[in-house]
Amino acid sequence: AAQRVADLINPQPGERILDACAAPGGKACHLLERQPDLKELVACDASANRLQRVVDNTERLGLTSTVIEADARTLPSEIVSPGFDAILADVPCSATGVMRRNPDIKILRRTVDIRQFAEQQLAILQGLWPALKPGGRLLYVTCSILEAENDAVIKAFAQQHKVQIMSIVMERGISRDVGWQVMPEVDGGDGLYFSLLSKPAD
């Protein structure tokens, strides 16, 4: 997933990038390794304990990031004001795309959980959008195979905001209305969903 995220965000020299739900930090590290000339990568997570794993992983690899404990739904103004060229939102989800590795999900997950996740995911997009510069791009990622957490969330968000949906094509998976769905594979590959949004410059 980290490889695909870096390909889709395509970080450029001098850019400020926000990893909004960053723990444990694998995707942030991959972005920093892909583009060592970023102006800044800000790694943000609501959990201080989980955020420490981001610090540990970046330090272990000799990488530099700005680490901030914050809820992506209500970012502090000092994060929002300079704006970001790109934002990664790898949001909390039902994890239905990784049931092969976590079979308990099939038993424990309830319908009400899916609705609550979808509400949280939409709130995260709402919270992040003001921090994205005009012309910037936001990559929405889940490890869910449920439309309620994927296309439905993006469509609901696009009804409320001026959004350009950018095309995604990968070597495997299925094109959806506003994103790309990778299904779990027999070889152990996880189920993932990606949607790439751009904020119009006008």
Residue ranges, per PLM feature:
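S-adenosylmethionine
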Residues: A1-D202
